[in-house]
Amino acid sequence: MKIMFVAAEGAPFAKTGGLGDVIGALPKSLSKKGHDVAVVMPYYDMVDQKFGDQIENLMYFYTDVGWRHQYVGVKRLSQDNVTFYFIDNQYYFYRGHVYGDWDDGERFAYFQLAALELMEKIDFIPDVLHVHDYHTAMIPFLLKEKYHWIQAYNNIRAVFTIHNIEFQGQFGPEMLGDLFGVGAERYEDGTLRWNNCLNWMKAAILYSDRVTTVSPSYANEIKTPEFGKGLDQIMRMEAGKLSGIVNGIDSDLLNPETDAFLPYHFSKSNLEGKIKNKLALQENLGLPQDKNVPLIGIVSRLTDQKGFDIIASELDNMLQQDIQMVILGTGYHHFEETFSYFASRYPEKLSANITFDLRLAQQIYAASDIFMMPSAFEPCGLSQMMAMRYGSLPLVHEVGGLKDTVVAFNQFDGSGTGFSFNHFSGYWLMQTLKLALEVYNDYPEAWKKLQWQAMSKDFSWDTACVAYEQLYQQLQ
């Protein structure tokens, strides 16, 4: 099967979040299964700086962005049997960053038009065109309304994945003529209109053959007003084409037996190295070295979405327990201040690292006993899967991908891979932590069983990609 991904970012070239991870991993896994896979993304200045000497110039052409006649350079690089095509235009993409400019609408309108015209020019007409988030959300609409005259495009099936429903691409309707070069009929009849704006994401939901998001629970949640960010009505209307597929993690890179960032390696069969990592981290961060004290790890952006309001409300309470806690991350200033204050007040219990450090992050996953992640909402979440891979049991709020990936401890049969609570409040976070501490302190065999079960879970992309493969096959 020929599959083309179009996205605004992709690891290792340009990455700001989870979308970049998916584009770096899913095409590679599909290629391993024998599919012919290509990725189209912008050629940013940071791509040129890091990979410019490896990337070949393929061709160039011009495209019309409304009245503008714009240059489209095409560059190419093959990696892991996936061909990456880069759209090169320094005016649009040499900004020192991926997103956040006043003209993002124009930048990504240009990118979508260039990507669609590129397919014919490189003679790669995919069976499935898989687009991601609002930056590429007009492609399914353009495929059917603007480029339908290209006969080769008529059998292409479009899949749209929502990674972040908060950013929907809402613009003035004049953009249809001014940038995309199409009439306003579909806006005037209400198809593309939402809240009196042109809504790119709504267009993708209506015009795609399938819509996916990054976990089954989140797919259900975005059909509700609480999580749908204003698009819940459209999600309910189009529920028949909506499904959720949990993202994977790179299990080759994230491997406690080989991770280069760890001073000691370990496996689910031999956790001796995990204890040594704990002692090493305690020494490194100036905490008292004690292999028996439960160590709670947090690696996260410090925001309300990640549940830091309820963590902050209970932090004094938590630090009365016989625990140690290590926090790594940056975010809202008041949370940074709160954790720094409590770290100075309880220097033997709390280490607050208000920065981001990949090496330290891996060491926290490997050293901690409990990984705290009580997100208010979480479309998928990768940290809880990484924690389980390293034998750190997640303590999570049952929402989105957290609900789908963490099995709550069952005290009757010992099953589970972590601890969870349903009602989003500091009280239930604290009660769940007390349960986890009780199991850790009083039932060591039950704890070891939970660690074994967590480390046995397969969250690899090779497994996650099977669900995408089945989805694509349903469209043929």
Curated annotation (Swiss-Prot):
It holds the Pfam family Glyco_transf_5. SUPFAM superfamilies: UDP-Glycosyltransferase/glycogen phosphorylase. It comes from Streptococcus agalactiae serotype V (strain ATCC BAA-611 / 2603 V/R). ADP-alpha-D-glucose binds at residue 15. One of its GO terms (biological process) is glycogen biosynthetic process. Synthesizes alpha-1,4-glucan chains using ADP-glucose. Pathway: Glycan biosynthesis; glycogen biosynthesis. The keyword Cell inner membrane does not apply. Belongs to the glycosyltransferase 1 family. Bacterial/plant glycogen synthase subfamily. The keyword Transferase applies. GO terms for molecular function: alpha-1,4-glucan glucosyltransferase (ADP-glucose donor) activity; alpha-1,4-glucan glucosyltransferase (UDP-glucose donor) activity. This is Glycogen synthase. Gene3D superfamilies: Glycogen Phosphorylase B (3.40.50.2000). It comes from the Bacteria. Signal peptide: none annotated. It catalyses: [(1->4)-alpha-D-glucosyl](n) + ADP-alpha-D-glucose = [(1->4)-alpha-D-glucosyl](n+1) + ADP + H(+). Keywords: Glycogen biosynthesis, Glycosyltransferase, Transferase. Its EC number is 2.4.1.21.
